[in-house]
């Protein structure tokens, strides 16, 4: 049985997650990420999500943290028209590999966001640790810093009696 599970896990990881398989929070996170991406001034063309490599949502007291890795490809439309259904992916259009970390509060209020979408040729040059650090900051957005207890956070020592 174990021999079957490992190849299955590897195959599922290679196939990726389809948009239809995303949870409601993950779909909302993807929508926020696409809106944020198309707001940036350097982006002139509309991009369309072509695949979702991984999607994880984690509940926290302040809301849901969504971490997405997905790919975008340039379309034939300008960026202001990115939501239009007639925008088709250009076969030779630029491709981007994105990391999005979104913290959604109650009533889909966005508490924090990080959207990083370098062009696919630049992906290897970007330091992953920097994006992970920023992603952790987004994950902690809206949380009470005193709501978690970590071992060693408080240390008390009892004085020895005087002799």
Curated annotation (Swiss-Prot):
Species in which this protein is naturally found: Pongo abelii (Sumatran orangutan)
Disulphide-bridged cysteine pairs: 77-87, 98-117, 101-135
Alphabetical UniProt keywords: Chemotaxis, Differentiation, Disulfide bond, Inflammatory response, Secreted, Signal
The protein's name in its UniProt record: Retinoic acid receptor responder protein 2
SUPFAM superfamilies: Cystatin/monellin
Entry PTM: Secreted in an inactive precursor form, prochemerin, which is proteolytically processed by a variety of extracellular proteases to generate forms with differing levels of bioactivity. For example, the removal of six amino acids results in chemerin-157, which exhibits the highest activity, while removal of seven amino acids results in chemerin-156 which has slightly less activity. Some proteases are able to cleave at more than one site and chemerin forms may be sequentially processed by different enzymes to modulate activity levels.
Gene assigned in the entry: RARRES2
Record-linked PANTHER family: RETINOIC ACID RECEPTOR RESPONDER PROTEIN 2
Maturation propeptide residues: 158-163
């Amino acid at each position: 049985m174990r021999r079957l599970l490992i190849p299955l896990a590897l195959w599922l990881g290679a196939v990726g997650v389809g948009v239809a398989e995303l949870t409601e929070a993950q779909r909302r996170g993807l929508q926020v990420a696409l809106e944020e991406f198309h707001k940036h001034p350097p982006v002139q063309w509309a991009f369309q999500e072509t695949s979702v490599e991984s999607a994880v949502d984690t509940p926290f007291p302040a809301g849901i943290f969504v971490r997405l890795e997905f790919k975008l490809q340039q379309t034939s439309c300008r960026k202001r028209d990115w939501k239009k259904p007639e925008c088709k992916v250009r076969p030779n259009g630029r491709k981007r590999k994105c990391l999005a970390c979104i913290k959604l509060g109650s009533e889909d209020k966005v508490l924090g966001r990080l959207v990083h979408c370098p062009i696919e040729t630049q992906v290897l040059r970007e330091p992953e640790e920097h994006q992970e650090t920023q992603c952790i900051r987004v994950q902690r957005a809206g949380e009470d810093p005193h709501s978690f207890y970590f071992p060693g956070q408080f240390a008390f020592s009892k004085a020895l009696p005087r002799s």
